[in-house]
């Protein structure tokens, strides 16, 4: 009897596409207006001086300058700013 029984169905075999989140420009790097600094879900980093936030919480430079990361406030919030070089 050279027959093969039907294989059972599997519940695996799927995976979502990666979203490429994270820091795109690091502290001390020169940046132009409109460049993306951080792609994130929620406000892991908050916008500081010279930085805007998109509707998906992406942080981007509003002015040309140098990226600066800092921790401020009683809650230890992390802020990203752009300071003019």
UniProtKB/Swiss-Prot annotation:
**Under the cellular component aspect of Gene Ontology, which terms does the record hold?**
cytosolic large ribosomal subunit
Biological processes per GO annotation: translation
Q: Which Gene3D superfamilies match?
A: 2.40.50.100
Swiss-Prot/TrEMBL keywords: Ribonucleoprotein, Ribosomal protein
Q: Which GO terms describe its molecular function?
A: structural constituent of ribosome
Enumerate the residue ranges of region (Disordered). Answer: 1-21
- InterPro entries of this UniProt entry? Ribosomal_bL27, Ribosomal_bL27_CS
Q: Which family does it belong to?
A: Belongs to the bacterial ribosomal protein bL27 family.
Protein name listed in UniProt: Large ribosomal subunit protein bL27
Q: Name the source organism.
A: Ectopseudomonas mendocina (strain ymp)
Upper taxonomic lineage: Bacteria, Pseudomonadati, Pseudomonadota, Gammaproteobacteria, Pseudomonadales
């Amino acid at each position: 009897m050279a027959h093969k029984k039907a294989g059972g169905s599997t519940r695996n075999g799927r995976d979502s596409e990666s979203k490429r989140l994270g820091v795109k420009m690091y502290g001390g790097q020169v940046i132009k207006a409109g460049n993306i600094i951080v792609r994130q879900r929620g406000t892991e980093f908050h916008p500081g001086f010279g930085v805007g936030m998109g509707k998906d919480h992406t942080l981007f430079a509003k002015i040309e300058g140098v990226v600066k990361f800092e921790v401020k406030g009683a809650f230890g919030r992390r802020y990203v700013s752009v300071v003019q070089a």
